[in-house]
Design a protein with these regions (language model features):
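Juxtamembrane intracellular "pre-TM" segments in multi-pass secondary transporters
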Residues: 1, 179-211, 215
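Helix-loop boundary and gating motifs at the non-cytosolic
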Residues: 1-47, 205-244
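Hydrophobic core of transmembrane alpha-helices in multi-pass small-molecule transporters
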Residues: 12, 93-111, 214, 294-308
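Loop-to-transmembrane helix entry/capping segments in MFS-fold secondary transporters
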Residues: 36-37, 124-136, 238-239, 321-333
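Helix-to-loop junctions at the C-terminal end of transmembrane segments
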Residues: 52-66, 152-153, 255-267, 352-353
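Structural signature of the two symmetry-related core transmembrane helices
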Residues: 70-84, 270-285, 365
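A membrane-interface helix-boundary motif in multi-pass transporters
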Residues: 150-167, 350-368
Length: 381
């Protein structure tokens, strides 16, 4: 099997795990008796832990040697599998909250390593098409979401840990299948010239884009984590949730599979700015939607919002960073996903409990607008 095919399996397995974890966190924890505010606190707290963990793992991978991306990913995948086994044993509520939060932390920590693998193979002269592999990830996400939506509607949220267990086992298998020649350890050279300056000074546009990305993803996380409540406000249920998530994932496919061509025509920074504007339009659409059909229609905009963001953010880090900072750059961009989850889930849970769905969507729209403006500013730097 070619490296390209194996990498597609890796992305597919990862996004199935992401779907079972992040896609159905609210469905599962609501079924376990948690409030929206408590769910926000759990996801935010462990998101903070993930935000600390991601850059540290990125620096370890950047050093090369034995602690490359694959050994680190194997450890995280094995821990995730063990976590899923414990969840299936139906522990007490408090322990369940901690275990599921830890699972989300591990899933977030895996992302920069999964993305960095494609550039590792390219550096060794093995062509890997990141866009098509990420498209396979979206396709797997869509299929699992449809299946889980139907299962949770019939059997309840308690089925989610079993889905997590199956996805974690598959992902661990796919990590094991990946060939990996360890990169030579990089010598610790004394930085010279502008290398002595801080990250913010060396990469000002990148740092502004990190802020923009965090706000875009705060919007994205609010409208995903609390999508079951958004649908419930217009008469929907968990079966509609499965359809909505799957529709959004399917809408990602044209962009994911065609991104290599798109990237040849536009810079990654420009594409992130376009994604920001699409998040704004999507937010307005959510606010105007008065039915399940309206929410489903808004999901079509996933093609121009998150789909563009997911691919362009990986390329943006690759384009913006010097060679010795590339995996760290990937980790920083992945941190915006975690930081967006912390901000969106924490604020979203509190606003939803206190003010309801309408105000929640207005707050989310404000975040999207601010993120789009910052992305435009970053492009001017």
């Amino acid at each position: 099997m070619s490296v390209n095919a194996r990498y597609r399996l890796l992305q597919g397995g990862y996004w199935m795990l992401f779907c079972a974890g992040y896609g159905y966190v609210t469905v599962f924890l609501l079924a376990e008796g948690f409030s929206a505010g408590a769910i926000g606190v759990i996801t935010a707290l462990f998101g903070i832990f993930a935000a600390v963990l991601q850059p540290w793992l990125g620096r370890l991978a950047d050093r090369g040697g034995r602690l490359g991306w694959k050994p680190l990913l194997l450890v995280l995948a094995a821990l995730g599998l063990g976590d899923a086994v414990l969840l299936c044993l139906r522990p007490p509520q408090a322990v369940t909250g901690v275990l599921f939060g830890a699972l989300l932390m591990l899933i977030s920590a895996m992302m920069p390593l999964v993305n960095a693998a494609s550039f590792h193979y390219r550096s060794q002269g093995k062509p890997v098409d990141f866009g098509s592999a990420r498209g396979v990830g979206s396709l797997c996400y869509a299929v699992l979401s449809l299946v889980l939506g139907q299962l949770t509607a019939r059997l309840g949220g308690g089925i989610v840990p079993l889905a997590v267990l199956g996805a974690a086992a598959l992902f661990l298998l796919f990590v094991l299948l990946m060939p990996c020649k360890p990169a030579p350890a990089k010598p610790k050279a004394e930085p010279k010239g502008d290398k002595r300056r801080g990250f913010l000074v060396r990469y000002p546009a990148f740092c502004v884009m990190l802020g923009a990305s965090t706000l875009m993803l705060a919007f994205h996380n609010i409208t995903n984590t609390y999508l079951i409540q958004i649908l419930g406000a217009v008469g929907g249920d968990s079966a509609d949730l499965g359809v909505a998530i799957a529709l959004a994932a399917v809408m990602e496919l044209p962009v994911m599979f065609g991104f290599s061509r798109i990237a040849r025509r536009w810079s990654a920074g420009s594409l992130l700015t376009i994604a920001g504007m699409a998040f704004v339009v999507k937010g307005v659409w959510y606010l105007m939607a008065g039915s399940v059909r309206g929410i489903l229609t808004a999901q079509i905009l996933q093609m121009f919002s998150f789909a563009l963001f997911a691919s362009a953010s990986v390329y943006y880090a690759e384009e913006s960073m010097e060679e010795q900072d590339k995996v760290t750059g990937q980790a920083c961009m992945s941190c915006t996903i975690t930081a967006g989850a912390v901000l969106g889930n924490l604020v979203g849970g509190w606003v939803l409990d206190a003010c309801g769905v309408g105000i929640l969507l207005a707050v989310a729209l404000g975040m999207a607008v601010t993120g789009a403006v910052l992305a435009g500013v970053s492009e001017k730097l």
